[in-house]
Amino acid sequence: MFVGFLLMTLAASSIFAATAAEPRARDLGVPFEGSPGTLNAITDVAGVSVGQVTLVEDLADGNKVRTGVTAILPRGRGSFDTPVFGGWFALNGNGEMTGTAWLEESGQLEGPVMLTNTHSVGVVRDAVIAERVRAGGADASGYWWSLPVVAETWDGHLNDINGFHVKPEHAAQALSDAKDGPVAEGNVGGGTGMVCHEFKCGIGTASRRVAAEGQGYTVGALVQANYGVRDTLRIAGVPVGQHLREDRVYTDLALAVAGEQPGGDTGSIIVVIATDAPLLPHQLKRLAKRAGMGLARMGSYAGNGSGDIFIAFSTANAAAAAGAAVNQAQFVGNDHLDTLFEATVQATEEAIVNAMVAARDMRGEDGHYAKALPHAELVKLLKRYGRYERSR
């Protein structure tokens, strides 16, 4: 059992938090391919739960806290007890996802996937181990060990990232609060201070229902989006970034120093893919790779300064991953993976747009400001390009 903590630093956490009840991309008429699950969220994959802690505070010393933690538990409360098969892929490795050496070697994800800011990876990693020890997961012999998976993106434009405001109790609370059902998006959890294509962004999620080998399966995606420049942004094929040119965070010509052009894509994105389709670790690595195509649809080119790192896991084959001496696992044949690949691309793309739509304007550290994607202007562009689809 996870131990909850009283979070004294969450006094203003509701100011910028977008809730799952607010409009999503489809509500604005953005057309997407594929059939979503009931919630159109990663939690459509049975057993997956998500917990988030959002930290927003204006400190007395003038610094601004705009950060948090997101926890994805593949098997809910049983995630520490029963691993899942998993695989990962770095499209561009200017970032961090701990625990991937053992994930690559073993093919198993043991415990949750945690998302936070770049300079809080260590404290979150340690907190996950501490929670497992506290829950009785440690071997009494003293030889038990854990290599948690913690991934990051940089929120230092809006957040006092060097103030180290994420504490162990925040990671513990994200784990304790994890639940199924709708997932809050936008300025929440690890995505609180993130910026995407120079619009305010954060956490987003989506899902797809597909058939493979005559069976129905679900693929879900959750993103912590913090990548991209405005010029390349495309939504449903519409060159949105070429039209909405105001309030750019990084590439406005007014930001140029000594006549030099402002910087390019220096952000990052973490994509978490979940499925109930029975897949082996090497197949899940193939699935993770397809997340990059969802980014490409959005206009990402995976710039040198961007950490684009993806992880995929399957909740199937629980018995095979339980640690017996000899195990049997089912898996979808390689010739039948295409629908799952396509679903991954579609869900990743929609999750990113959902993150942008849910986010709200935010002012943060040093007065820095990130404007959210303007809904009305997006709808106008969709109609102009014949891509508007009335929500049902």
What are these regions (language model features)?
Residues 18-392:
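Alpha/propeptide regions of enzymes that mature by internal proteolysis
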Residues 3-14:
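Bacterial N-terminal signal peptides
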